[in-house]
C-alpha cells in the first residue's frame, strides 16, 4: 500500500483542492484521522495515523480506489500541501499510472450489472491475466468477466487489454462469492477457477464450499460448466466431493494436460515437475430463482444531538454473532458535531466493511453494500444496537 511518514502535519483547513484532487472533510478519534478524498469519479479515505516520531499517511484499506494512481496522486498532493519533514515514502506517481477512467474496470455491482449482456464467462482470481486475455481473444463474442481481490491485478490487466486491443472484458474487485450472489440465475456459460490458493492446512479459507458450489449451479446456464485447474490434489479432491452432493452432475477429470495458454504459476509448477489436475463439472439440473432484493431502510432512523453524544460516550468495540450473519462495531470518529462509524458485517464467508455517517440521519459514506439477505439482517441489527447498546 503506498504511504509516507512525516514528522509534522500543518493545520488542515478543508475543503482543499488541487490538480483534480479534493480533500472535503475530516473525521478523527484519538489515534486516527480520516480525510474524505475525491479524485475524479472515485471517493476514498486518506488515513493519518499517529506513529513514533511522526505520522503515517496512507490510503484506508477498506475504501481504497480501484486505480492505484488515484491514491498515489492524493498522497502526493497531501504531502505537498500539509506535511513537513518527510521521514520516508513508499509511493511514486508514475507517468504511466492508470489514472483515467478505463471502461474495463467497473467500480461497483450496480455498474457491473448494467453492462452484463450476451454470453458471459467468469474467471475467478485472474492474476496476471494471461488466461483471461486468451479467452477474450478466442471468444470475441463472449464477455469475459474477471473478479480479483487485488487492485494491482485489475490495473495491470486493464493496461494489457488496452495495448492488445481486447475490448470484451470487464474487471471488478470483489470476493468471488459475493459476486456470484448478485448475478442472475442461468446467466453464465463458464466459470474458471485456475490455481486458487489451496489452503490445504486451512480448508475453511478456500473459496470452494457448499454455498459456493450452489451459487455456481444457480448462475450457470443449462449446459454451463465450472472448470477448476490446480496443482493441489487435496483441493481437487475436496472440490469433487462438494459437487458430488448434487443429484446428477457430470464430470471430466484430467491430469497433466497441456492447455493452449499457461499461467506463470503453471509454468513454475511444471518446472518443479508437480502434477496438474483439471476438474470440469456440468449438468447441475438445479431449479433456481433470482433473489428478491430488499432495502436497508436507513431512513427510519433519526438522531438528536443528545443521541449522538450518547453514542459517542457509550461506544464499545463489540461483535454480535447470529446464526447466519455477524455485526462488528470497529471504530468511531468525530466529524464536527457528527459521527462516523466503521463496521464490519454480513455473512461469515462474505464479510463487508463500511463507514456510516451519523448526523440527523444515518447514511453509508460510500457505495451501499449489496443487498444480500445477510447484509440486510446485519444492518437491521445495527439499528437496534444503536438504540439499546448505546442507550439512545
From Swiss-Prot:
PROSITE patterns tied to this protein: SAM_MT_TRMB
GO cellular component: tRNA methyltransferase complex
InterPro entries for the chain: SAM-dependent_MTases_sf (IPR029063), tRNA_(Gua-N-7)_MeTrfase_Trmb (IPR003358), tRNA_methyltr_TrmB_bact (IPR055361)
GO molecular function: tRNA (guanine(46)-N7)-methyltransferase activity
Highest taxon listed in the record's lineage: Bacteria
Function, as annotated: Catalyzes the formation of N(7)-methylguanine at position 46 (m7G46) in tRNA.
Protein name: tRNA (guanine-N(7)-)-methyltransferase
Lineage: Bacteria, Pseudomonadati, Campylobacterota, Epsilonproteobacteria, Campylobacterales
